[in-house]
């Protein structure tokens, strides 16, 4: 309720106690993978009379997980397991999900102790320029992103915004 139309998502956001239990399940290893369900909508649509469900999530997934780790609620080692290794194994994506010789070098470099927050207007990529996490404190900041060995983001700059993805068949 505190987010108003900005928090309209499916399934709906739950009470804090339910979210805390989900974090505890993640910490116990009961959760196989984490995804962002990135569903952004422009400000004008979310402020309209019938706001659509969804919110941006891909840019805040890692900062949320890093903050949980900094707070001691999950381990840092768990983050690449549930965001990379296990999803690649579950979907049969070869040469992905680990950092090994011969694998795709897709990774994020972070400053694990940096305290920061998303300021209004910071989101420069995608179809919406807002975040449900605006002004909320994070601990741990993504500093650079590599895709298949190439930097896409570093030093607060995007090096490429064109489509870089490739179609992957799951096994």
What are these regions (language model features)?
Residues 3, 12-20, 52-62, 77, ...:
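Electropositive phosphate-/nucleotide-binding environments in soluble metabolic enzymes
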Residues 1-2, 44-47, 120-122:
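Short acidic, glycine/serine/threonine-rich loops at helix termini
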Residues 101-168:
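C-terminal cap of metal-dependent C-N hydrolases
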Residues 18-22, 95-96, 131:
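A generic local structural motif
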Residues 1-34:
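Histidine/acidic residue-rich metal-binding segments in metalloenzymes
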């Amino acid at each position: 309720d505190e987010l108003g139309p900005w928090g309209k998502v499916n399934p709906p956001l739950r009470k804090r106690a339910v979210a805390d239990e989900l974090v505890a399940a993640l910490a116990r290893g009961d959760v196989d993978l984490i995804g962002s369900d990135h569903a952004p909508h422009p400000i004008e649509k979310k402020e309209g009379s019938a706001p659509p469900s969804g919110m941006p999530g891909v840019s805040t997934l890692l900062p949320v997980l890093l903050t949980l780790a900094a707070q001691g609620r999950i381990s840092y080692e768990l983050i690449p397991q549930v965001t990379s290794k296990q999803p690649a194994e579950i979907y049969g994506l070869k040469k992905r999900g680990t950092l090994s010789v011969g694998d795709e070098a897709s990774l994020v470099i972070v400053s694990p102790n940096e305290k920061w927050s998303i300021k209004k207007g910071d989101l420069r990529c995608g179809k919406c320029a807002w975040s449900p996490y605006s002004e909320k404190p994070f601990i741990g900041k993504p500093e650079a992103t590599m895709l298949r060995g190439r930097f896409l983001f570093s030093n607060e700059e995007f090096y490429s915004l064109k489509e870089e993805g490739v179609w992957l068949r799951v096994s």
